[in-house]
Amino acid sequence: MRRLSRLAGLLAALMLLAGCQREPTLWQQESYVFGTRVQITTADVPENVARPAVAAALADLDRWHVRLHAWRDDSELTRINRALAAGQPVDTDGEVLGLLRQAQDMSARAEGLFNPAIGQLVALWGFHADSFAPVRPEPGALARLLASAPSMADVQFDGLRVSSRNRAVSFDLGGMAKGWALDRVADRLRQAGVKSALINIGGNILALGSKGDTPWKVGLQAPRDNQAMAVIVLHDGEALGTSGDYQRYFELDGVRYCHLIDPRNGSAACQRQAATVLVEPGPDAGLRSDVASKPLFFAPRADIARLAGRFAIRDVLLVEADGHTWLSPAMQPRVQWLQRPQQVDVLTGFAEAPT
């Protein structure tokens, strides 16, 4: 079955939590891109400033949605994938080329646990569709695709030209496009004079300024119900990203399969319910918040601190398949529990949180 961004709706309600010394003037606009709900809320920004700035940002999102779509026939990404599958180099523009270069860098940082070159694997599992059937791939087809080992390391760049040493490379940027877009929307709003806003693209969130006299607050969804399990305060420039098994998934023979495909073995069987990261301000905070949650969704706990460090991240929350929840030392004081899980423990390998 398909679950359409329950988290996004939850965040919309929780970001308006009480606690301000004064009530700010809020203005909000919504849209639907990248297969999910988008909400941009401004605080104490005149509507004649907020409205055109947000409209321009939403227009950019609509354009990126079409250009970066992994299975639309008319998308720029599909055109590139077709050329690579035919063994041909292909020219693109600076915007897409820059994104692909970032994808290669992020994949290397993630030690292959984030691999945007496995679009064929995602399609084989049936997730290149707005709705999908509960069907496992044919084992032989899955084995052949895994043997071809598509990787971002196969991709080469020469000016605006993209080529691949491996015809099995097929780009699917769904694991980074929302975060990449967050950074660009934030830049557009800042340039338009919007100093305080909360940008929510399907649960990937970036805060600008504050909500009146207090920071923005967002809710963190409990993976197995439609309620918030915690609230997290976001300061200016911080970004929050979650990868979970509860948005796009199906169940078959008692096993939950989600759209997050493990690049190591091609499995969609979920070993973890969710991985959440909080990223400090920076020009790529949104991108890192989106990407870093993927390797942390797959990696064993012993590797979490090291992998998070490769993205300069200290704030991590994991929910295991049995609901056991783990937090890094820095994340502990940031989480305000509404429904505290039965088991909560501290992840090892991180530096202690500053006092």
Please state what every model-predicted region is.
Residues R2, L11-T355:
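Mature catalytic core of soluble alpha/beta enzymes
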